[in-house]
Amino acid sequence: MEKLTVLILVATVLLMIQVLAQSGGDKHLKRRPKQYATKRLSALMRGHRQCTPQNVQCEEDDECCSNLECKCSTVPDCNFPKCRP
């Protein structure tokens, strides 16, 4: 059921992009829905994910919440990096 829902959402987004691209609108207005649709589709394919908050141990930047990086603040080659700004 979840895959069907995602498929319907993807089809809707693609149809919306096609309709907007065929209309005689401004180029800037055409580009924005495509950017939004790409980001939304990417988020749907990845599924729900929780980010790692600040000062919590991490392994790579992708798992940290936005505006945070997985790094050590004291030693460059530490064993336990944390999500930090």
From Swiss-Prot:
Coiled coil: none annotated. Expressed by the venom duct. It is found in: Secreted. The keyword Heme does not apply. One of its GO terms (molecular function) is toxin activity. Residues 1-23 form the signal peptide. Keywords: Disulfide bond, Pyrrolidone carboxylic acid, Secreted, Signal, Toxin. GO terms for cellular component: extracellular region. InterPro entries: Conotoxin (IPR004214). Residues 24-49 form a propeptide. It comes from the Eukaryota. The modification Pyrrolidone carboxylic acid is found at residue 50. Contains 4 disulfide bonds. Belongs to the conotoxin O2 superfamily. The cysteine framework is XV (C-C-CC-C-C-C-C). This is Conotoxin Lv15a.
